[in-house]
A protein has these predicted regions:
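Conserved small/polar residues in nucleotide/adenosyl-binding loops
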Residues: 166-172
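Conserved N-terminal Rossmann-fold NAD(P) cofactor-binding segment
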Residues: 38-74
Length: 172
């Protein structure tokens, strides 16, 4: 991840399991100097930011905090993890409709404050929501990326390791 280096500001929108895990990884590896967590549930974002600060006290220095869209000014990278999880019995089409509405409300707000950032969309279903993010934001498509099939690739690697009795890293 050569793009994210010291001196860079990263904003993570969505402080749920995925957003918090991404934020923690960025902090523990020292891949940015500023890390902002934004969530509609402000106490959740605050709690996750505190957990990351306390959990990385002996790691490279990263300024971790919670905030609002306006605090994302000068972000170099924005990671979007918003959306609801699929409920039992819910179709992927219904999930897509719900999460597209959420994306349509988030993107215009964040792009007001971070129009020059690169965006990584991690929300599900990622391909549709990446397209939605581009459409509703007006951002240059070259600056908006979907996480794509990373999870599928990880699952394949895990299965290959299990059936071949080898370490996960043997299948890179």
């Amino acid at each position: 991840m050569d793009f994210v280096k010291k001196g860079k500001k990263v904003t993570v929108i969505g402080a749920g399991n995925v957003g918090a895990s991404i934020a923690f990884t960025l902090a523990i590896k020292g891949l940015c100097s500023e890390l902002l967590l934004v969530d509609i549930n402000k106490p959740k974002a605050k709690g996750e930011a505190m957990d990351i600060m306390q959990g990385t006290a002996f790691c490279p220095a990263v300024d971790v905090r919670d905030g609002d869209y306006a605090d994302a000014v000068n972000s170099d990278l924005v990671v979007i993890t918003v959306g609801i999880a699929r409920k039992p019995g819910q179709t992927r089409i219904d999930l897509c409709k719900t999460n597209a509405k959420i994306m349509a409300s988030v993107m215009p707000e964040i792009t007001k404050y971070a129009p020059n950032a690169c965006y990584i969309i991690v929300s599900n279903p990622v391909d549709v929501l990446t397209y939605e993010a581009i459409q509703v934001s007006g951002l240059n498509p070259k600056h908006v990326f979907g996480s794509g099939t990373v999870l599928d690739s990880s699952r394949l690697r895990t299965c290959l390791a299990a059936v071949s009795y080898t370490h996960l890293r043997a299948h890179e």
